[in-house]
Design a protein with these regions (language model features):
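Residue position within the beta-strands of beta-propeller blades
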Residues: 26, 67-68, 111-112, 152, ...
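Hydrophilic extracytoplasmic domains
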Residues: 23-25, 190-233
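Sec/Tat signal peptide C-region and signal peptidase I cleavage site
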Residues: 16-20
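Blade-terminus and WD-like Trp-Asp/Gly-His loop motifs, strongest in beta-propeller folds
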Residues: 56-64, 101-109, 142-149, 189, ...
Length: 233
């Protein structure tokens, strides 16, 4: 078994909005015929009249562009992925729900959106056809891009789940009740209030709750647990 020392430059996830790329790419044209152009005035998109361009995102290497748009009179939005070198469409799909952000990794495009239930959904989509390969859901996700870690502190299920940010695969799940019992705190219900990064893949979790001890169920507690993630092959 070898320890995996992830290289920041290859696994970093970067989210770029249209504002970060407004110098190189822009939405322009007549009111009824908006298109996206690059800095050399090359037209990238070829939408029909009255197409609504809600947003677009450029990959860190400037080789791909994802456009979130809706054709005139259509009920649903579309996501279209372009190859900026060939100016051709790679893939297109109807994502079904809103697109609040897009993140780019080596192997996956991550569509991020807020669900109707209040949580955040990370959809890991293939660059080839935009199909969903993997999904991570969390009410209060903690994103450590530099460490390639995505954390789901799930108070309801009394657990903390760690994922690789770059591909959404699960690394480790911590049972909070067992972790607290190791500190001689026998908890009934818990609430994870805050997560802080305190080192390289090392995190501090601020937890409060009630005891699960006969006659002491009304007693409250506050504590902190620290967890360090060591990735192994």
């Amino acid at each position: 078994m070898k320890k995996v020392f992830l290289i920041f430059s290859t696994l970093i996830v970067i989210s770029l909005s249209v504002f970060a790329q407004e110098i190189k790419f822009r939405i322009d044209g007549k009111p009824y015929n908006k298109q996206i152009y690059d800095e050399n005035n090359n037209q990238i998109t070829n939408f029909k009249n009255w197409e609504l361009i809600q947003d677009f995102y450029i990959s860190p290497d400037n080789k791909k562009m994802l456009v979130y748009h809706r054709p005139d009179k259509a009920k649903a939005f579309l996501m279209t992925l372009y190859n900026l070198e060939t100016k051709k469409i790679i893939a297109e799909c109807e994502p079904g729900w809103a697109c609040n952000d897009v993140k780019w990794t080596k192997n996956y495009l991550i569509k991020v959106w807020g669900t109707s239930g209040g949580g955040i959904r990370f959809e890991y989509r293939s660059y080839e056809d935009l199909s969903i390969v993997r999904v991570v859901n969390s009410y209060y996700p903690f994103e450590d891009v530099e460490g390639n870690i995505l954390i789901d502190p799930d108070s309801m299920m009394k657990k903390i789940v760690f994922y690789h940010y770059s591909d959404g695969t699960e690394i480790k799940t911590i049972d909070c009740i067992k972790e607290l019992a190791n500190k001689k705190i026998y908890a009934g219900w818990i609430q994870i209030n805050e997560v802080k990064k305190i080192g390289k893949r090392k995190y501090k979790f601020y937890i409060e709750g009630n005891l699960n001890i006969e006659g002491r169920q009304e007693e409250e507690f506050k504590t902190v647990i620290e967890i360090e993630i060591k990735c192994e092959l």
